[in-house]
A protein has these predicted regions:
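N-terminal alpha-helical transmembrane segments of multi-pass membrane transport
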Residues: 1-79, 89-96, 107, 249, ...
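Transmembrane helix-loop junctions in multi-pass membrane proteins
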Residues: 5, 36-40, 80-85, 161-174, ...
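Membrane-interface loop-to-helix entry segments
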Residues: 24-31, 39-48, 171-178, 201-251, ...
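Helix-loop-helix module between adjacent transmembrane segments
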Residues: 28, 32-33, 74, 103-128, ...
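Extracellular/periplasmic helix-exit of transmembrane alpha-helices
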Residues: 33, 114-121, 126, 243-261, ...
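Flexible loop linkers connecting adjacent transmembrane helices
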Residues: 38-65, 87-97, 101, 109-145, ...
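Membrane-interface alpha-helices at helix entry/exit sites of multi-pass transporters
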Residues: 57-62, 94-102, 137-152, 186-196, ...
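Alpha-helical membrane segments and immediately flanking helix-loop junctions
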Residues: 58-91, 117-141, 152-155, 159, ...
Length: 479
């Protein structure tokens, strides 16, 4: 029964993440990159400046520009960076990392565009809080005739929260990492409530504790999520990057060989002639799918957080938000991927998910293996924890749109979300990630269509902002 279900999921996954969706993701990113004049490269220093400057603050919004980015990063920097990269490389070979980079490069322009549009078309909910995202820029930007597409996006957004990035994959990754450290052989097991599958005691205990902690934070709403994210995300990201850079420095002679392996695998050059195209397609599918899972460029989630930023100019928040893709994929995922390829951890039989990355850290860091495993477990737990918080916020905003801001339904949904966190540890790793891929792809489709339709608005708004900025700078210079 379970085998048939997994086979069904694999079939659906192959259909959703076929060539058409991959082509649409790359086309959207390339279109916006070209039309914006490679702005993600030219304006990167300005984006970093806006991150810390007071220049972005405005009257509208609930959190700072930095806070909005941290909420977005809290939702994106999660198991995708540690477990997702490992599963992509194990399934598609080292070449998956190349396609992840390519998707991120053009995805940075996508992230700028969707977050800018979210700020431009945001609105105020009945209780006074700011709400925005693809559902509003589809409805307001494309017109009422496209409201069905906005509702479709919001519906898939709820599904991604419940079954995709938000719950199952994150809590499953956390508890798997904890079990791998405290009880790798599952010597101590328990059957919770007498009906759930038998699991390691460490999994059961950590699952219950995390469910309670998440529930306490979620009750506080957006501002509490923002405060937690602003503290946790930078701290844990710095620790992870330091460990990753240490791995690369201690294995610097292996880096050139790793890049050769990545590029050969990306284009199927190591496969037999007849299987080269097939190997390339698998690497492309897994790399782009996991890249989207990790940085969420094009999915339409980050715009929901960006809409709450205290900015007057939509383009400013777009610039700040695009840094999320740079930090998430081009830095953190690259560190994970290179560590896995350099150490060959992806080739070890019997390892999957977090265990692959753990093995890479243990083999590459010049510290006791238990210490390396503990550091990775800690990073994974905090990354995944903040992702759970961020995706509750995203999916609740989607549900508010679907239900015309019915807070009774939203409150009920919050408890359903918490329940999904409770049962997540008892699901298999492969099923969790396949379900996540499927719903992510479905959520991305309406948003990508909207970004293509509204690319003219993006370009016009961007030109208007930079013209205004140039005039302001010129006036200050003359005075």
């Amino acid at each position: 029964m379970l085998t048939s279900f997994n086979a069904f999921l694999d079939t659906v996954d192959s259909l959703v993440w076929g060539i058409p969706l991959i082509a649409l993701i790359l086309f959207t990113g390339l279109l916006l990159t070209v039309r914006l004049g490679f702005m993600q490269i030219r304006k990167l220093p300005l984006a970093v400046h806006f991150l810390t400057a007071n220049e972005t603050s405005g009257e509208h919004g609930e959190v700072s520009s930095f806070g909005a980015l941290c909420v977005a990063l809290s939702a994106t920097i999660g198991t995708g960076n540690i477990v997702g990269v490992a599963t992509a490389i194990c399934a598609g070979g080292p070449g998956a990392l190349f396609w992840m980079w390519l998707a991120a490069l053009v995805g940075t322009a996508t992230k700028y565009s969707e977050c800018m549009l979210a700020c431009k078309y945001r609105t105020v909910a009945k209780d006074g809080h700011i709400i925005g995202g693809p559902f509003y820029y589809i409805e307001k930007g494309m017109g009422q005739n496209w409201k069905w597409l906005a509702k479709l996006f919001a519906f898939f957004g709820v599904l991604v929260g419940l079954f995709g990035i938000g719950t199952f994959s994150q809590i499953n990754g956390i508890t798997s990492a904890i079990r791998g450290f405290f009880d790798p052989d599952s010597a101590h097991t328990v059957r919770v409530l007498g009906v759930l599958p038998e699991v390691s005691t460490s999994v059961a205990i950590s699952g219950v504790v995390l469910t309670i902690v998440v529930a306490l934070v979620l009750i506080g709403g957006m501002k509490r999520i923002s405060k937690v994210a602003e503290f946790v995300v930078p701290f844990m990201a710095i620790i992870y990057v330091i460990c990753g850079v240490a791995i690369l420095l201690f294995n610097v002679t292996k880096i050139p060989g790793a890049f050769v392996e990545i590029f050969q695998s990306a284009f199927g050059l190591r496969a037999a002639a007849g299987g080269a195209m097939g190997a390339m397609i698998v690497a492309m599918q897994k790399g782009i799918a996991r890249g989207i899972f990790s940085n969420e460029a094009g999915i339409g989630s980050a715009p929901i957080a960006a809409a709450a930023a205290q900015v007057e100019e939509p383009a400013q928040q777009g610039l700040v938000s695009m840094l999320g893709t740079v930090i998430d994929t081009l830095i953190i995922c690259t560190i994970t991927g290179l560590a896995i390829v350099i150490t060959g951890a992806w080739k070890v039989e019997g390892l999957e998910g977090a265990a692959v990355t753990t093995r890479a850290f243990q083999d590459a860091l010049p510290i006791p293996s238990q210490a390396a495993a503990f550091i990775l477990m800690l990073c994974l737990c905090f990354f995944a924890f903040t992702t759970i918080l961020g995706w509750d916020y995203y999916s609740e905003r989607c549900l508010e749109y679907l239900t015309n801001d019915n807070q009774k339904i939203v409150s009920g949904y919050r408890w359903l979300y918490i329940f999904c966190i409770f049962i997540g540890p008892y699901m298999t790793v492969s099923a969790v990630w396949t379900i996540a891929d499927i719903v992510n792809g479905l959520m991305a489709l309406p948003n990508l269509v909207a970004l293509i339709a509204l690319n003219g608005v993006v370009v016009a708004e961007t030109k208007k902002y930079f013209a205004k900025r140039e005039n302001k700078i010129s006036a200050l210079t003359r005075s």
